[in-house]
Amino acid sequence: MSMTTLVILRFAGIFAAYTGLTVLLPAIMFRRILVGRGLSEQFLMCYTFGNFYIINIVFAVQLLHISGFWALVLFTAVPGILIWSRVNRVSLRELCIKTGIICKKILQGSMGMRGALYRVCNRIKTVLKRSVRLFYYKVICNTLQWILVGAVIIALFWIYGRNLLLTYGYCASDIPVHLNWINEMVRGNLFSDGVYPFGFHCMIYYLHTVFRVDTYAILCVFYLVQVLFIHMVLLAVMKLLCRSLYLPYAGVLVYILGNLWAKQTYSRFGASLPQEFGMIFVIPSVYFLIRFFQTEKEKLKTRETKLLSGCFALAFSLTLAIHFYGTMIAGLCCIGIAVGFCPRFLNKEYFKRIMMTGIISVFLAVLPMGIAFAGGTPLQGSLGWGLSVINGGKSDTEDSEDKTIQDITMEEMAARLNENSKNNIKSNNAKSMQTKRIPAMTETPESTFADKVREIPEKIKKHLEYDGSAYRGIYHKLAGTMVCICGTYRNCSCHSAWSDIYYPAKDYLW
């Protein structure tokens, strides 16, 4: 099997598994609620709940330290069956009794296998008839719109899908860090590097554990799954908010094909990154909030309004559970929507409900991280840095810089002492040099600016006399690392500019 065929099959399998978990499973669970709604709204509701459901299942089993294949399957199936029976008003007790009676008849011989197969075939025929009828009304009767959907998908594969075949790699330097965190989850170590939004990592971990696909292989192809759903969610929201029937397709196609923004804006779509995954749920949160404010005051207590506010809470909590940047953007969008609906936002009934929904959404996202933090897991470095900046204290970056400066100073001092030990013949000079450096290690009065200027020529002369092997080793390692990195991603469109600059250094060094 060629590498191209293998990559295509892997992508198809991961896309089918992810779509089944996040779209098909919620569609079965909430079939009665979704009946009568448009296909776009059904898709948004299913996709939002599906991701929230899977991500929090992983959080639950990880925090309980029972994570594994069977734990994930049971925690997915059992609550799913209970929700399905409750929403669709199906009595599990009666269903189990009927199934038990049929099995008993088969075992007793009062019902033959032909009779049992006849019932199963009739049930399958009924499901197939419903599927054909649904396909006719949703697809055949809207042929032109589905042709435009196909055009959007073809454009996505042309712009982003080619990189899947041309460059089999991560295409982003920070993906190995996320890979390590996911591998630690396999070992039962949630938040191995500290508390951090792990929604993206939970989804990749679920696909790896349940469907037995290597994590590194998922991260190589999952970016295209993200890109497809980003644009499908965008198209669905535009179809729901725009009065024009075909303008949403034109807008999405222009966004895909038009080179309107900086290259970095598009290149990040070529890698499986949490930030881009979290951006998906900014769009549903905007839609559900607009729909909530469009509801009349008399209908605020209806089940439909509660459903819309619940979907908004799930979507907004997903932005916070996956990446903080998505939450910032969603928050700015919510502020803009509140300004647009200012009279209703300031109304007591609307304000009370939307604030309560926002608090619940933040609580749902922070709860797993809060449990881990309360259990003794420290915050990840980026979170600690953000909190220190907010509090006005010294950031972790400054601390690390101070530590680096101290380390460099100690290395220089060690190199100088080593040089002095080699020159045993010039012991008197070595002693004088050591005595000159002793005041640098103790508290001495600060020298004036003129003294420092006069010391510069002497310091330059001393540095030129020292053996620069240690410094050359550092420079060679740094250059070799840059060559390795840029050589690895040379074929990637996201790193072509960097590789063209650094890759010729290979011939010079090696």
What are these regions (language model features)?
Residues 165-171, 186-201:
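Membrane-proximal lumenal/periplasmic loop motifs of glycosylation machinery
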Residues 1-140, 486, 490, 494-502:
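Membrane-embedded, hydrophobic transmembrane alpha-helices
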Residues 23, 141-171, 360-376:
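Transmembrane signal-anchor helices characteristic of membrane glycosylation enzymes that use polyprenol
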Residues 47-58, 149-157, 200, 222-299, ...:
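Membrane-embedded helix bundles of polyisoprenyl
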Residues 60, 177, 192-215:
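Short hydrophobic/aromatic helix or loop-helix immediately within or flanking a transmembrane segment
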Residues 195, 199, 353, 357, ...:
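Periplasmic/ER-lumenal interhelical loops and adjacent helix-loop junctions
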Residues 329-363:
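Perimembrane helix-loop-helix junctions
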Residues 2-4, 66, 203-225, 230, ...:
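Juxtamembrane segments of multi-pass membrane glycosylation machinery
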